[in-house]
């Protein structure tokens, strides 16, 4: 069974230099792309915004979700982040039926 997941990262405390933020973003992006069955959205804050943030919305299978969760935990520690937001839930399609 798959579920919809949202991951959000940020650098609002300026712990990461621009180069490190770019590496962190790339590693999270790569981890999601290699585990998600479908990515619905990915985006980041405007380049001139005061704070750097990024978010992904995607569908993922249960087994892959467990692997990704462990990888995201590792990346949080590796890049000295206090937290990474992970939200998951069931998607309900509203249609004419």
Residue spans for each PLM region:
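Short S/T/G/P-rich N-terminal loop/turn motif that feeds into the first structured element of a domain
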Residues: 1-24
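Extended, folded cores of ATP/NTP-driven motor/assembly subunits in large transport
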Residues: 8, 17, 54-57, 83-85, ...
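Short, conserved charged micro-motifs
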Residues: 15-19, 62-70
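Short, flexible N-terminal segments of the mature chain
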Residues: 18-38
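Secreted/extracellular ectodomain signature
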Residues: 22, 41, 95-97
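Short amphipathic alpha-helices in soluble, non-transmembrane regions
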Residues: 24-27, 66-79
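Short, intrinsically disordered low-complexity segments
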Residues: 33-66
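Conserved short beta-strand edge segments in small beta-sheet-based binding/regulatory domains
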Residues: 37, 77-96
